[in-house]
Each structure stands twice: as C-alpha cells, then as structure tokens.
Amino acid sequence: QHVAWDYIETRSADLNLLTDTDALVFGTLAARNEKSKNTLFELTEASNYNVFDINLRPPYYDIHLIKDLLHRTQLAKFNKAELRMMLDFMGKDYVTEKDSIQYLQDVFRMNEIIISKGSKGALYANGNNFHLYPTVPVEVKDTVGSGDSFLAGFLSKRLETGTNAHQIMHQAVALGAFITAQKGACPEYTLDDFTKFRDQHLVSTLPL
C-alpha cells in the first residue's frame, strides 16, 4: 500500500483525452485507496467504453465498490474463480457459466463479459451471443502477463471497425499464447513476429 497508484489525481487533460479515447481499462487494485478511487469514478464518467479487468485479491477489494464499478462497465473480464466469487457475493447459486453470465448482464446492464478459463480457453459473451475458444497450444515458459496480453489482443480487434467475434477471439487467444511461450511478462517482439505466430495457429469456436 501507499504506492504511486494509490494517489492518482484527476487531471482535466485526462478527462478531455477520454472524450476521444476508444476505451478506459482498469482493475480493482487501482481503487483500493480513496484518492485513486475518486479519480477512477471521474474517469469512468468521462469514458464511453469502460473495460473492467477484475482482480479479486483479498484484502484489496470491497464488494460494494466492485458492484459500483460494474454498473459503470461495458466489458468485464473474470476468471472462473472470480465469476463464482461474484455470484456468492450476490447470493446467486451457480448453475452454468451461461446462466451466470446472463445474470450479471441483466443485473449490471452490461452486454459484454469475458471468462478466462485457463487451459480450457476463454468464453466471450456479447448480448445473447456466446463464443468459446480454445487456448493455442504452446510450450509454456512464463504465465505472467498472459491475461493482460489476452485482453490487449482482444481489445486491439474489438475496437477495430468491421471485425467479428472470430477475429477478436483469435487475436486474443493467440497473443496470450504468444506471450506465454516467451520469458517475462513484457518480452520484446515485433508486430510481424506476432502476426506470423497468429496466422500459423488457427483456432475454431468450441461447442458450449
């Protein structure tokens, strides 16, 4: 605690920037301190597309804060454990992933949810459309950064005009695997390196 991200200040330049920015991406830890929490709430008001990468790491989260942020969110990303934890917090029994996602969509009026499933791939829900994709098989060298790279790959296509769910998810699972196959959370690589890897590892949607 008491590090730089606990004391992020609201700046008019940042609020102005968000009016022309494609997305605001944030996690839970950024709101553990009152100063940064207030700033985050102001930023979400200025942003048109809020992406919440949920991190339920005790003791650095508050369920009331999580709910408040989800009400401001257009796209939320959970892992399997976080999905079940969220349902427990809300007194909802787990039935299936699809039922759980639809429940959260309804409660928070949020169309898009991603569930990362580790070695079993990832599920993307956009409204009533569900897309399950496998992981790309690689020799794992470092899993640090794989979740962030998955989301970065997802957004790089999601925010492009004219892309479809297959292109979005292929980019996401490919970039996650590409980073996992290298040492370090932020390995050096070129766009050509990744594009070649992605195009050599084609994937297809899985049955739900």
Kindly label every feature range from the protein language model.
Residues 1-2, 78, 135, 191:
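Active-site donor-binding loop signature of nucleotide-sugar glycosyltransferases
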Residues 1-38:
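Conserved phosphate-binding/catalytic loop of the ribokinase/pfkB sugar-kinase fold
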Residues 9-13, 37-40, 61-65, 98-102, ...:
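A generic local structural motif
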Residues 13-16, 42, 65-68, 103-105, ...:
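Structural motif
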Residues 23, 27-98, 121:
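Conserved beta-alpha-beta core of the PfkB/ribokinase-like small-molecule kinase fold
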Residues 90, 94-208:
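Conserved phosphate-binding/catalytic region of the ribokinase-like
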